């Protein structure tokens, strides 16, 4: 069954285009579903099946869209949370541009600028315009708030490997 944090305790990436069909066949229910820069209503050939699933509270209890832009899928969300553009968040990127292998690292410009000015923001949103959360920090913070004592097994995935029992920081995540 598709329950509790999407197929197990945690799922970090979007599910397949089959999700609304699984829900329609009563193979499970999504208590909470986050979409992240994801617009299946527009991009998938069966967008109307997504509309049906997202509108049916017996299939998707709560839909939260993390997106830098308003889109067709966000329209059917219970909450729409702004997500930073590339200059407002950390990101690892690699594109097929030639026959070589490479990876690039992006970091939030204003957070780095604040550091160079002697300020140390705890969260990137404190430096970003409009207090936009950085996605990785959002998931870390949300996980700690959902599971403060660690009884659900969620918090353990976001513990610092360098400071026992402490919350993972964004710098440690990308170290």
Predicted regions and their residues:
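Non-catalytic alpha/beta scaffold blocks inside enzyme catalytic domains
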Residues: 1-172
């Amino acid at each position: 069954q598709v329950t509790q944090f999407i197929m197990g305790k945690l799922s970090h990436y979007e599910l397949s285009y089959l999700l609304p069909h699984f829900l329609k066949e009563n193979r499970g229910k999504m208590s909470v579903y986050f979409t992240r820069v994801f617009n299946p209503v527009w991009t998938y050939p069966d967008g109307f099946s997504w509309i049906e699933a997202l509108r049916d509270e017996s299939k998707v209890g709560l839909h939260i869209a993390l997106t830098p832009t308003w889109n067709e899928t966000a329209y059917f969300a219970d909450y729409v949370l702004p997500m930073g553009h590339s200059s407002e968040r950390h990101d690892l990127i690699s594109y097929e541009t030639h026959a070589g292998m490479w990876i690039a690292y992006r970091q939030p410009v204003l957070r780095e600028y604040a550091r160079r000015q002697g300020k140390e923001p705890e969260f990137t949103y404190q430096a970003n315009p409009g207090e936009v959360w950085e996605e990785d920090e959002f998931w870390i913070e949300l996980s700690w708030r959902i599971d403060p004592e660690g009884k659900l097994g969620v918090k353990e995935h976001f513990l610092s490997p360098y400071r026992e029992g402490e919350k993972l920081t964004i710098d440690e995540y990308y170290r």
